[in-house]
Amino acid sequence: MSDLELTVRPLRATVDTQAFSEALKNISLVLKKSDVPILEEASVRFSGGRCILTATDMTTWMIAEIPASGDDFSFIFSRTKKLELVCRRFDGSLTLEWTENTARHDGDGFVRLSCGSRTGEFDTWSTDLCPDIPKVDGDVSFSANAAELLERINRVAYATLK
């Protein structure tokens, strides 16, 4: 073999499918049609045994964090809304394998989702394209259950309708 072949090993992480699907559904609430395509997608970061999903419309930031195992890596989904529908069909342990597309020089790649015998591939974008989460210094901080808070907001949303 005269040419040196470079084999790229995909970075791999595993999450619970139901937790991932629920987290993706929750953060997708903030995703809207935008002139900036990256703002229509969800960012995913695996770090320190956690999977952190983020979405923004530049005024609201939604972040969901779930347990994960595997390598540390990050990417931005392409077609997040479709992926949300696909994840509802999976059950059990979900494996995400991210491979950088070496044919391109912009850091794009693809992610393969595997759950049992079902698999799917989605294009990804580099997290360099995603805006940074602004630092907020608050005098008071508190913890809240996001699901309960959203339920309360939905319960009184009728009062804001015209």
Label each region the model flagged.
Residues 1-162:
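Structural preference for solvent-exposed beta-strand-turn elements
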